[in-house]
């Protein structure tokens, strides 16, 4: 995914990284990470049996069939943690399907990336609900939404958002690191020629 590549383009390629993916699907993101980074350890998992069967065919990573949401609480240390949620918003992260989310930060990873799909709807539809969750008066744009999310995350675990990559109106890919940082945003339109992906 071109958006994910941009998120991690500033990672030190001369350093070895351990990577943990909790919702690895069929391994698209895992393949990208293997090609981008100097990987010393790579653990991937998915709850779906067909996805797991495909993942385990590639020996570049360790594959497990497990519930990624529960596995977040295992408190394993990895330099980079990837949470490619099939759907998510701040509501899911705080008190919904992915409410174990903050557990990903307990082991103090260098980088945590995740997917947010709230932008499939206009901010006018759910913005008031998101504003309540983030303890702010109102949200008029997704830029404001992610800035408020960054502030919330910093108050919770001492990490903040440094990059948000918008893949058209389908999803946002988020990168957080320790400390308080200025958020950088970039949009990646989907075209007929690449659909937001490139061949490796």
Regions found by a protein language model. Give the residues of each.
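A short, conserved alpha-helix within the catalytic core of class I
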Residues: 88-104
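S-adenosyl-L-methionine
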Residues: 1-14, 29-31
């Amino acid at each position: 995914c071109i958006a994910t590549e941009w998120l991690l383009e500033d990672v030190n390629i001369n350093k070895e990284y351990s990577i943990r993916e909790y919702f690895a699907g069929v391994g698209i993101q895992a393949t990208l990470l293997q090609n981008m980074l100097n990987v010393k350890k790579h653990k991937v998992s998915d709850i779906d049996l067909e996805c797991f069967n495909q993942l385990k065919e590639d020996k570049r990573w360790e594959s497990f069939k497990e519930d990624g949401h529960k596995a977040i609480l295992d408190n394993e240390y990895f330099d980079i943690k990837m949470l490619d949620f099939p759907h998510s918003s701040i509501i899911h992260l705080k008190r919904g399907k992915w409410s174990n989310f903050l557990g990903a930060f307990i082991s103090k990873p260098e980088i945590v990336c995740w997917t947010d799909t709230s932008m499939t709807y206009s901010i006018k539809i759910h913005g008031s609900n998101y504003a309540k969750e983030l303890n702010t008066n109102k949200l008029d744009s997704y830029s404001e939404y992610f800035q408020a999310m960054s502030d919330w995350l910093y108050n919770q675990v001492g990490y903040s958002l440094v990059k948000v990559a918008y893949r058209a109106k389908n999803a946002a890919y988020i990168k957080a690191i320790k400390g308080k940082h200025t958020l950088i945003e970039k949009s990646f339109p989907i075209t007929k020629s690449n659909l937001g992906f490139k061949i490796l």
